[in-house]
Amino acid sequence: VALLTKSGIPVINSYFAQGGIAAVTDEDDATALHFEDTIIAGRGLCDYPAVDILVNEGPQRIHELIEAGMHFDMEDGSLALGLEGGHHRKRILHAGGDATGRMVTSFMISKVINNPKIDIFENHSVIGILQENQECYGVRAWNLVTESEELFYADNTFLTLGGTSAIYKRTTNPHTTIGDGLALAFNAGCEIADMEFIQFHPSAIYTESEEAFLISEAVRGEGAYLIDQNGERFMPAIHELAELAPRDIVAQSIYRQMLKYDQEYVWLSLKHLDPQVVKHRFPNIYEKCQELGIDMCDRIPVAPAAHYMVGGVRTDTHGQTNIKRLFICGELASSGIMGANRLASNSLIECLV
């Protein structure tokens, strides 16, 4: 197996995921409920068979990760579960408090690095798909170090190049997420679907420097409130789940408040929460807020930011595109799971399933 990455191996969107992984692991939960929450968040436009695979195979993938040595946060001897927007049950597994993406990807990377059957090619940017008669047989890549083109031949090719969110002024994504994977697939003749759906995360820090550091949805899951310029909550009047409504609803509601008061942000208030719990549960976010001169235990200025490409390259439930032997995985794929809007923390579990 040849693994190509256009930068260093850790620089992937999954690495920056804070909240966690959604999967049914508690006896008080059910896959039917996870299925329903996914469909509701997706505005009914999800592919039902694909969602069924996600929610039913997800718990087994989590079990396999744990058996392989992955450590998730525990509470009283059981998996610690968080609550996020659109979920009617606590089912979000997390690791390192608010560093789930980093912990899971670091764990997987260690397995890859130590696997003698996998060769890693860093600083290799894929610039073309090798194909003939609608059948892929590899890729053309540009070696960013030697500044030369290289060919990689393969029986099966998988593109996992993420989304397009870095083309927006405010984004939670790394700068490499510019849609080059989408362009590659489109130029190769792949079918593209649902590109009208771009998810904006409701709560990214607002600063004058335009840095949009993500404030995990799990912070609202722990009880943080969204308040307007008068210090009043506005989400309870908009949705029954208040601050934990699906992301599209929360992001739209925040934007309307910004227009109403002619402000660039609203406030995420944690004043009423135990500071020690906040620091323990969200150590990385707390540290980042300190760097920016923000007291996380008081209130944080937040505004929506481009976060996730819901649409992408059309695939079946195996990741197969309309071009033989070319597969798409992760955010770049449009398998129908997300519908019009992704349910929080369904992205990492989709990658595992």
Model-derived regions: residue spans:
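Glycine-rich loop(s) and the adjacent beta-strand/alpha-helix scaffold that form part
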Residues: 156-213, 260, 346-353
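Short beta-strand to alpha-helix junction loop
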Residues: 46-59, 92-110, 121, 171-179, ...
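An anion/pyrophosphate-binding glycine-rich loop and adjacent beta-alpha core
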Residues: 9, 184, 190-301
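A glycine-rich dinucleotide-binding beta-alpha-beta segment and adjacent secondary-structure elements
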Residues: 121-122, 127-136, 141-142, 281-333
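Glycine-rich active-site loop/strand segments that organize a redox cofactor
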Residues: 23-54
